[in-house]
């Protein structure tokens, strides 16, 4: 494809050409070798992805510093200002495509689609600090994309540090111990949180002997902690035979409605007074025998 054949695409992408530096691996020709990147305004309901450009076919080993340098050159050429915040979802080697934690346990996998972001390989989101920055950069890209036909010599040359053999060897070295500790701690915390939530969901559906289900509010401790706290006070309580609770009918029933109920109640009161009188008599006899009885004290 020649330089004159490049144009803006119908699907909204802008063609962003770069001149590649001379290298022995590139074919020798009078015209400079080009690399084409494609950019489009990103539209998403996710607030974290606002003010972003969707980039396709990034140059090899691109990072945030390379993109900031390019945006600085672009805005300087057209007398405008644009500030880049970060480069999102730039997973060139596909290191984050497989989540081993989700493969080992169902508790680590999430059914919420919004929690996991899927992006094609060799794509990224270039996030700007505000709407003015992305508008300035977008307008400058439109002007820059038209240079390939009339002024091909004004195209920017993509500069990057060629990785050495040592760089690739270090890339496949074992991960740092501190990084592994932090990553394991984070995943274990998430695992324990979801496991506790799953246990609470199971316990909340259990109905006790009285037909009640324990309900816990948002600001209350978990169900298991409440049950353990009750059980620790009296470990034998789980073996006790629970008395049948008084029904509403028994509570409302009058205890002195019939005559025999009144007689029984009076008889019980008299017997209690008589037993107490006899106990006092016996206690007075003992005190008199010990000569400690004083009726005026």
Swiss-Prot record:
A Pfam family reported for this protein in Swiss-Prot or TrEMBL: RRP7
The entry's keywords: Nucleus, Ribosome biogenesis, rRNA processing
GO cellular component, one term: UTP-C complex
Subcellular localization, as worded in the UniProt entry: Nucleus, Nucleolus
GO molecular function list: rRNA binding
Gene3D superfamilies on file: 6.10.250.1770, 6.10.250.2760
Keyword Nucleus: yes
Listed GO biological process terms: maturation of SSU-rRNA; nucleolar large rRNA transcription by RNA polymerase I; regulation of ribosomal protein gene transcription by RNA polymerase II; ribosomal small subunit assembly; rRNA processing
Protein origin, superkingdom: Eukaryota
Family from the record: Belongs to the RRP7 family.
Assembly mode: Component of the 90S pre-ribosomal particle.
Main function: Plays an important role in the synthesis of 18S rRNA but is not required for the 5.8S and 25S pathway. Is necessary for the cleavage at site A2. Is required for efficient association of RPS27 with the pre-ribosomal particle.
Additional detail: Present with 2610 molecules/cell in log phase SD medium.
Name used for this protein in its record: Ribosomal RNA-processing protein 7
Natural source organism: Saccharomyces cerevisiae (strain ATCC 204508 / S288c) (Baker's yeast)
């Amino acid at each position: 494809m020649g330089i004159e054949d490049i144009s803006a695409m119908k699907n909204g992408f802008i063609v962003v050409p770069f001149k590649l530096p001379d290298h022995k691996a590139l074919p020798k020709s009078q015209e400079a070798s080009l690399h084409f990147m494609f950019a489009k305004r990103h539209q998403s309901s996710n607030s974290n992805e606002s003010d972003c450009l969707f980039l396709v076919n990034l140059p090899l080993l691109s990072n945030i510093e390379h993109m900031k340098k390019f945006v600085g050159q672009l805005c300087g050429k057209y007398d405008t200002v644009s500030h880049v915040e970060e480069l999102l979802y730039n997973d060139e080697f596909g290191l984050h495509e497989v989540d081993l934690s989700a493969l080992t346990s169902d508790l680590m996998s999430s059914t919420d689609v919004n929690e996991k972001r899927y992006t094609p390989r060799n794509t990224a989101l270039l996030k700007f600090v505000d709407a003015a920055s992305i508008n300035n950069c977008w307008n400058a890209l439109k002007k820059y994309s038209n240079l390939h036909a009339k002024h091909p010599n004004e195209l920017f040359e993509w500069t990057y540090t060629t990785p050495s053999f040592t760089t690739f060897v270090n890339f496949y070295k074992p991960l740092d111990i501190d990084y592994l500790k932090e990553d394991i701690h984070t995943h274990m915390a998430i695992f324990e949180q979801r496991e506790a939530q799953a246990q609470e969901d199971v316990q909340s559906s259990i109905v006790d002997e009285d037909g009640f289900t324990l309900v816990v509010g948002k600001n209350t401790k978990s169900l298991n902690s409440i049950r353990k706290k009750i059980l620790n006070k009296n470990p034998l309580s789980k073996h006790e035979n629970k008395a049948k609770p008084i029904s509403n009918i028994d509570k409302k029933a009058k205890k002195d409605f019939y005559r025999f109920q009144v007689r029984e109640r009076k008889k019980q009161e008299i017997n209690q007074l008589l037993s107490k009188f006899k106990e006092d008599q016996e206690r007075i006899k003992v005190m008199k025998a010990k000569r400690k009885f004083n009726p005026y004290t």
